[in-house]
Amino acid sequence: MSYRTNSQTYNTLSIRGITPPAAGGSSTVGFYMDNMPITDSANGGIRQSMGTIFDIERIEVLKGPQGTLYGEGAMGGNIRYITNKPDPSGLDYSVRVNGESISESDGISTVTNGMINIPIADRLAARIVGYRRDRNGVIDQVAPRSEEDVDTVDETGVRAMVSFYPTDEAEISLLYNRVKAEYGGPGLGYHCFNVGTPSDPNGQVPIYDLPGTTCAGEYDVYNSGDPYVTHLGHPTFTSGGDDEQEMLNLSISWDLPFGATLTSSTTQFDRKSQYSEETSPRFAAGVQGIVDASCFGLNPACVPGTLWSMGGDGLFANQTDRFAQELRLVSNTNSDWQWTLGAYYKDEDNTQNDLDACTVGGSPVYDTFEENCYLQYGFDPAVSIDDQRSVIQTLTAFIPGNRIYKNLTEESVYGELSYTFNEQWEALVGLRYARVGYGLENGSAGSNVRSEVDLSLQNDTTSTSPKFTLTWRPQADLMLYATWSNGFRPGIINPGVVARLAELAPLTAEDPIAKGHYDFLESKKLVDGDEANNIEIGIKATVADGKVSFTGSLYNIDWKDMIIAYDYSTNDVFGLTPFTVDLIENAGGAESQGLEFEIRAELADNWNLNVGGDFNWTAEITDATALSGAAASGRYGGVGISEGNRLANAPKNSFYASLTYDFSARSFDAQARLDGYHVAESWNTANNERPAPSYQTIDGRVTFYKENWKIGAYIRNIADEIIVYEFNQVGFRYGRPRTVGFEVS
């Protein structure tokens, strides 16, 4: 499993190399908290919130296509947090405080977690968990504005559960979870220099003349220097944003008298996030070109240099409202027959404002700008407020912006049936049938009013996903299995195509070029779903009198009709928005093959070793004929997507090892631990334009225990390795530098 942060609010989560190459569809990885689905399904999983790992009983990671155990099916796998439940037997509480100093950052970052378990009656209890994370940044902005540690994170959250146990066979739990985060920025290090692309020397980041900047401290993956700086800095622009999530779940579990457990899970999920981040000067140059083309000569306020040339505004605003209901019936007897039956319903509304209208309906007026207006902070400070108002009034008449409204509904049934033939052999079959509806409404240009829509589309798909597993246990401490499973993502609608079709429609009668674009994009409005077929052979064994355990699996995933995004240009038609269209299409196919393993060994008294890793030797596009060498969406340079390209965020290998030693120190029990990690080079996009280099880190920790107290000290990234998660024309996204911390609980 791979998890990395690509900006302050964008995260990438993948299992076995199955990473969504395009936003907008369902995530390839499902996410649960207990029985509550919290998957980022509207954005392809790129904004998945992970929450805090405190007062958690365990974390389950189910790899490969999942769809026959839980309602929220996924093509790559499922992750599930199992929380500790309220306990009526007695009062309990815990507190954990972390303080840490991050290299390249001033001050102390802190994380505070707390839990209290309150018995209310003999069979009724409440458990409340709260936390606050205050993390200092490491990125420094340089001239023309000097500001240090700008990529801050301030996050608070609460998880409260009330559980009632009316009988020994029944449980009713109400779970409320709320997270609120505020982010500083930018979270990217943009460096004003020219860096050639290793795979294509012609695909380069342009050199920009940045006034007031000497470009001291350049850094790239091949040269040394200070990486944690950004050569951006509008004199008045402030990057940052916020993310607020609220989740409410009612879960009822009942052990029925005929040998089965019935579970009902009802979930309401609401999320609102908005973020504005300075990005590369390329975006500012593009917007300045719009100013020049659309109103220069017609409006005297529109002159070259109106906008600040050192950075553009990367903006999004997103709102999600989801209701989900799941019923699951699972056998709980010792019979040779075991089974699971389930039904799932989901209704999700999503509003996106990647290019928000600058007014709340009506004529553009500066005083009524929405806070997400994409031009609001882009002007050179020397331009007067009156001229800014005049320019935006002209531009919003030409490019008014709009909102996109999405609706995702799913009705599915699923189940598994297994039979144990004898002590050695067991067979399992599973099936999932899903009916998914994906609707999209394109808001009228210049309007933020929900009822004003100029185009509505609907894409309905059905899928059947089977699963087969054969298990052999030749002896009590050895198990081998073989699995074939299928995962499916539903079809979606091209949001960028919808808006461009509305612009092209009035021009098709007289302009044959516009007609050609219109016909092509009309055929691309609806995108079929993609699917993955997984073959897996695995082993689980225990040897040396239980002192060594081993798990391993070989997997082969055939990804068909893969959904991918690329840029499509209509710049040869006069009068259209001069932006390319982010076109989503079923590009062809991909394949992922590899070996996963984990070894746990007791080396000697008090010494334990854990080693694990993944060899993902094949993770490549096998069919790209539908793309014809197109450039991946949102990236600079014409490096095409081709057969043989490696899938995004899929390193060829990754390993970890941890060594622990338990000892006594005066009146304390203690443990010393050393962890090492290696992640090979990977690509951030399917066109393999620029790689994120490999990295290795070593962490160390010493912890002392006494009664209910635990005191520890740790160092993460001991060697202060420069970790580059992403490298493209927007900048560098880094992992944490050396961090020295303490923990008391």
Regions found by a protein language model. Name each.
Residues 104-186, 192-194, 199-208, 246-248, ...:
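Transmembrane beta-barrel wall of Gram-negative outer-membrane proteins
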Residues 423-427, 549-558, 579-685:
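Gram-negative outer-membrane beta-barrel transporters
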Residues 12-16, 29-34, 47-49, 74-97, ...:
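N-terminal periplasmic accessory domains that precede
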Residues 36-63:
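Short acidic/polar hinge/loop motifs at secondary-structure boundaries
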Residues 113, 251-257, 261-267, 272-279, ...:
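Membrane-embedded beta-barrel scaffold of Gram-negative outer-membrane proteins
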Residues 363, 558, 676-685, 703-745:
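C-terminal beta-signal and adjacent terminal beta-strands/loops
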Residues 163-167, 329-332, 342-346, 404-557, ...:
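Structural signature of Gram-negative outer-membrane beta-barrels, strongest in the C-terminal barrel
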Residues 1-36, 57:
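Extracytoplasmic beta-strand/coil segments of soluble accessory domains associated
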